[in-house]
Each structure stands twice: as structure tokens, then as C-alpha cells.
């Protein structure tokens, strides 16, 4: 099957009809307005414009708002600005909108943070001190992340995307899992996605445990149950790209890893597929032929419930993935299926069946633009083109609440404001 996909003659390939999945995002609007020498294309635009471009021009099923520095720690001094941006976006958008950032525990070490760099301490054979530094940093990571998301959730965010969990090793994952646990306890209805930084959790500390399981050395199929236990709705497994090997070799390895993770996970899996992970080549402008083949393989062979679109230019990442395997958001029913995955932890098959039943259509109709255009206009649940008088933003989402039998956070905020 994989060989067939790789050898298909077309430049772009796509999943078979009916197998489309919802997409989530890393890096927010930075791929549009960012210009840091990586994958941002430097278009001067507001984040509202960036988010709505993903929703209405790219056909995204979900989107996220993110700070230009894209870590939780730098958000603290400007959290009021982030909250205002979130409110404005939620008033104008229909698809689920997350707040995304990296836990990035490395920012808590000197010279950027208050704690001694454990790498320097270990070089000096101060092992106990290095352990303590990591433990303190993890505590601060948990505290800061929870505080930031308390503010953002109060401003209408649908949820949070933890991007590159474990980037600084097992301490980073430890702090993030405890943040997820605290947020789930405080906000039962928050959408929580936890995407990993790498395929194996690095044992920088080595002794840290969560739920009695040592975090160091965990692989995707072992990470998934812990992320679910902490309270996440969706897990983002990773398989690293080996830049010394071919795309075919990397994709075969990635599909093998992710298929095992999907099988072991009690919650939906949105495989991370930015440049350098998930069988995607390491290039700022990811090759479209490689991206679409990887996207198709992950859906049809690994059986993922969704794809987390990561770093890469707009053409090579969101557009290519959505063309290959996405549900095209408000053009069809992608946003509705995504909401069921996040609000009820439904796997892709169950989510599609639920939404199709509520709409009174076949599952195949969920990606039929003609069928869904008429239905969305009739039900007033938001349409992708701007029709005067049609429900938009909060109004459309209130109708989606009634249709799907769920509560949407931005609608709850609006109801409180007019009470």
C-alpha cells in the first residue's frame, strides 16, 4: 500500500473519498505574518486576518492563535493583549480556535530564566543540583501555563494546544502533564491537544514519573495513555525525520510508529506533520509531492484521527495537507467533526457518524461541498462565503451548540456578558 502511494504518478495525491480527517495547527498565524528566516512568508497582517484566512481561504477545520515568541513564558507579560485578540477572533470566527504555545522549559534556565542551567551543573558533576533545577523549572512551567490558560479560557478560547511537549526532556513533559491535569480539573469542557516534540522522551532528569510511569525513554505508543490519563482530548504523536535518509524510508518508519500509537491511544490521535516530523522532509518550503503522500499514508495506513499541521510555508503545509486529506472546514463539515473529537473524545469514525446523524445525511456527505453548503445555510451554522444576514461568529456557534448538543466556550462567555 505504501509503495503504491509513493509511486503514484501525480505530483499531488489525496485520500480516498470518505476518509478525510480534521486538521489542527501548530505555530498559529506565524506562517503568514512571521519572517524569522524559517517558514514564515512575512505578509504584514493582523492575527485576526491570519486566523480568518485559514478558516475561509485555506479551508481549515480548526485554527489557533499564538504569540510571535510562541512559548507560554513570554506570553505572561502580554497576556491581556492575547486575551483581547482571542475575544475579537472568537467574535468573528466559527471553527474551533485554540490558544497554542510551547511549554519550552528551556526558557526557565539561565540566562533566560531563574534556575541554573542543568547542562552546566551536570558538566560540573553537580547531579543533585541539576535534578533540583529541572524539578523547580517544571513546577514553574505548570504554574505559568495554567495561569495563562485561565486568562485565555475566560476570554473565549475553545482550548489549548501544547506544541512540542517534552522539548527540554522528561522535566518538560512532567510539567506539561501536570498542567493538563490541573486545567482539566478546573475546566471540564476545555479542548486540550498535547503534541510531542520528538518520538522519544529524552531522560534529562531520568527519575521523573507520572502516574507511576517513568517518563524518560517513552515512545509514542507509551506516551499516548499517559497524555489521556492527564486529561487531554487529543494526542499528537511524533516520529522524527532522519535527514540522511530518503522520504520513502522516513515515511515507512513514521507510519509504523504512528500506527502503533493510534492503536494504543484511548483518545484521538492527530499526528504531527510539520517539517522534520511525520515523514515530512526538513525544508522550510516542504515539497508538495512528499507532503501529500505522507498525509495520505498517515490516514489510510496509520489510521490517524487527524493531522496537526506544523512548520512550513502556507502552500507546503496547510494547503497541501488540507487538499490531500482535510475535511475543508466550513466548506463542508470539518469544524463540526473536529468539535466532536475534542468535546467528547470521539475517534474519527464515531465523530463522523454522530455529526452525520445530527445533520440527517450520509457520512460521505460531510465532505460534499454542495450538500453541506445548502445545509449550513439552511441551519444557519456558518458558511464560508459572506452572505448578508447569515449567522456569523457567535450566532453561528450558538446554532452549532443546539445542533450537536454541546457547549462552546465563546458562546458561554457571550451569554455571561449579556446576562
Curated annotation (Swiss-Prot):
Keyword terms of this UniProt record: Methanogenesis, Methyltransferase, Pyrrolysine, Transferase
Pathway in which this enzyme or protein is active: One-carbon metabolism; methanogenesis from dimethylamine
Catalytic activity: Co(I)-[dimethylamine-specific corrinoid protein] + dimethylamine + H(+) = methyl-Co(III)-[dimethylamine-specific corrinoid protein] + methylamine
Disulfide-linked positions: none
GO terms, biological process: methane biosynthetic process from dimethylamine; methylation
Gene Ontology molecular-function annotations: dimethylamine methyltransferase activity
EC number annotated for this UniProt entry: 2.1.1.249
Function description: Catalyzes the transfer of a methyl group from dimethylamine to the corrinoid cofactor of MtbC. No evidence for expression of this protein has been found after growth under presumably inducing conditions.
Similarity comment: family membership: Belongs to the dimethylamine methyltransferase family.
Name of the protein described by the UniProt record: Dimethylamine methyltransferase MtbB2
Naturally occurring in which organism (per UniProt): Methanosarcina barkeri
Gene name in the database record: mtbB2
Amino acid at each position: 500500500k505504501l509503495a503504491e502511494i509513493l509511486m503514484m504518478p501525480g505530483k499531488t495525491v489525496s485520500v480516498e473519498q470518505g476518509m478525510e480527517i480534521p486538521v489542527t495547527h501548530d505555530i498559529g498565524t506565524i506562517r503568514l505574518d512571521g519572517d524569522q528566516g524559517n517558514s514564515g512568508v512575512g505578509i504584514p497582517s493582523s492575527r485576526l486576518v491570519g486566523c480568518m484566512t485559514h478558516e475561509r481561504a485555506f479551508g481549515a477545520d480548526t485554527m489557533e492563535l499564538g504569540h510571535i515568541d510562541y512559548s507560554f513564558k513570554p506570553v505572561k507579560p502580554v497576556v491581556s493583549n492575547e486575551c483581547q485578540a482571542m475575544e475579537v477572533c472568537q467574535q468573528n470566527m466559527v471553527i474551533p480556535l485554540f490558544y497554542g504555545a510551547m511549554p519550552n522549559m528551556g526558557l526557565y534556565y539561565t540566562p533566560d530564566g531563574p534556575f541554573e542551567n542543568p547542562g552546566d551543573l551536570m558538566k560540573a558533576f553537580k547531579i543533585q543540583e541539576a535534578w533540583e533545577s529541572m524539578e523547580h523549572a517544571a513546577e514553574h512551567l505548570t504554574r505559568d501555563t495554567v495561569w495563562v490558560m485561565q486568562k485565555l479560557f475566560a476570554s473565549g478560547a475553545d482550548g489549548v494546544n501544547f506544541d512540542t511537549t517534552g522539548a527540554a526532556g522528561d522535566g518538560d513533559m512532567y510539567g506539561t502533564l501536570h498542567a493538563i491535569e490541573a486545567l482539566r480539573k478546573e475546566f471540564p469542557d476545555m479542548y486540550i491537544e498535547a503534541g510531542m516534540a520528538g518520538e522519544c522522551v529524552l531522560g534529562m532528569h531520568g527519575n521523573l514519573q507520572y502516574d507511576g510511569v517513568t517518563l524518560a525513554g517513552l515512545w509514542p505508543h507509551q506516551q499516548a495513555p499517559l497524555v489521556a490519563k492527564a486529561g487531554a482530548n487529543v494526542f499528537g504523536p511524533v516520529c522524527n525525520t532522519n535527514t540522511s535518509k530518503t522520504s520513502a524510508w522516513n515515511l515507512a518508519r513514521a507510519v509504523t510508529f504512528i500506527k502503533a500509537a493510534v492503536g494504543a491511544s484511548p483518545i484521538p490521535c492527530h499526528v504531527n506533520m510539520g517539517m522534520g516530523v511525520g515523514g515530512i522532509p526538513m525544508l522550510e518550503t516542504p515539497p508538495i509531492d512528499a507532503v501529500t503522500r505522507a498525509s495520505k499514508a498517515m490516514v489510510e495506513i496509520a489510521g490517524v484521527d487527524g493531522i496537526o499541521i506544523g512548520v512550513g510555508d502556507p502552500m507546503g503545509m496547510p494547503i497541501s495537507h488540507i487538499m490531500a486529506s482535510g475535511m475543508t472546514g466550513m466548506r463542508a463539515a470539518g469544524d463540526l467533526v473536529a468539535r466532536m473529537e475534542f468535546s467528547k473524545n470521539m475517534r474519527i469514525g464515531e465523530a463522523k457518524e454522530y455529526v452525520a446523524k445530527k445533520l440527517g445525511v450520509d457520512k460521505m456527505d460531510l465532505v460534499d461541498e454542495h450538500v453541506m453548503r445548502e445545509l449550513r445555510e439552511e441551519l444557519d451554522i456558518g458558511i464560508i462565503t459572506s452572505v448578508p444576514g447569515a449567522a456569523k461568529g457567535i450566532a453561528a456557534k450558538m446554532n452549532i451548540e443546539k445542533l450537536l448538543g454541546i457547549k462552546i466556550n465563546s458562546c458561554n462567555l457571550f451569554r455571561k456578558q449579556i446576562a
